[in-house]
């Protein structure tokens, strides 16, 4: 059975790999010259199931209003006049209740924990190398109020059986020795020992090599124009003016997925959350982080690779704009300089931006659609690297008519209600 996978980020590539392992003939198509050239290229480097949390949370609307007035705010909104932006923000606000937060976080943790286990299994079986570390994640609280507010997340961790450790100020240096000199700036920390780190772009490149060895064909620099449908099935994909056909189709185009789905009458509430990163060469390994540190105040992650520090964060709701805002670089430099002043020189860093495909409830969209042979694997937000292996494996099981190893409740697009309308004559501009 032939499967056409649209998109070669970490999620699309993981989908292709697990589909090939399940015995499918797989072709991957992407507009870029190689895998992981967009959102997966320079993300924060975290594999953090325990910190899988929706942006839509109680108190966020009030915080967002305050953030709009702050120079180093973790969230910024640039109104584009796009109706989809307004609709997405309205849906997000509806998910900012305690009840919705608990449901959404449970779904995200369920998939993220499974995905981490799939990554462990993959690494044990294949020896795939991607500058990975299995040393946990430490969330830093600069105020007692932040430390107290962590109670709701700890409750979810306990219900999900996720190990954690609450650290006082003096204990933080035990897991992150370089923070000893700045411990006076901190009130405490929450450590998740089972979280991991690694270079997502390097992982995706190596996984693509393994997928090729299983027979997967990658076609790069090809322009995906639109999906052709006939009744309740996809008849093919128009790529550079030619109709490509397969038995099954997997859409893994991240933030560009809605553009391909809307003409089919499928409204996928996936909107780009623009993020930024700095990749800083390490100057003193002893003064650099050991794993990943999360600064709760600025929502910035600082991650250790072999000879580099990856500093990632921010969220801009600003459409598909990929311009680099120097103010965001200033924030990232400020945070890493404040916590690790001797770890590396931010002036030598590489500054990057990417678009995270976010849903209003934080949970990705994985599985079937109203079209019998079209499947989705998109909407992972800031957790594409964390969720990639599990999402790919779940998707492969669904296509193979196997029962996935975890519950898929609440993961497919049908949680948003009716999605199929009649759009006979809609032909969008090329999305990917």
From Swiss-Prot:
Q: Which cofactor does it need?
A: FAD
One Pfam annotation, family name? Answer: DAO
Reaction(s) catalysed (UniProt annotation): a D-alpha-amino acid + A + H2O = a 2-oxocarboxylate + AH2 + NH4(+)
Q: Which GO terms describe its biological process?
A: D-alanine catabolic process
Q: What is its EC number?
A: 1.4.99.-
Signal peptide, first to last residue: none
The annotated pathway is: Amino-acid degradation; D-alanine degradation; NH(3) and pyruvate from D-alanine: step 1/1
InterPro entries assigned? DadA (IPR023080), FAD-dep_OxRdtase (IPR006076), FAD/NAD-bd_sf (IPR036188)
- Might you report a single GO cellular component term? cytoplasm
Q: Name one GO molecular function term.
A: D-amino-acid dehydrogenase activity
Top-level taxonomic group: Bacteria
Q: Which UniProt keywords apply?
A: FAD, Flavoprotein, Oxidoreductase
The residues that the entry says bind FAD are 3-17
Q: What does this protein do?
A: Oxidative deamination of D-amino acids.
Q: Which HAMAP family match?
A: DadA
Task: State the similarity comment.
Answer: Belongs to the DadA oxidoreductase family.
The protein depicted here goes by the name D-amino acid dehydrogenase
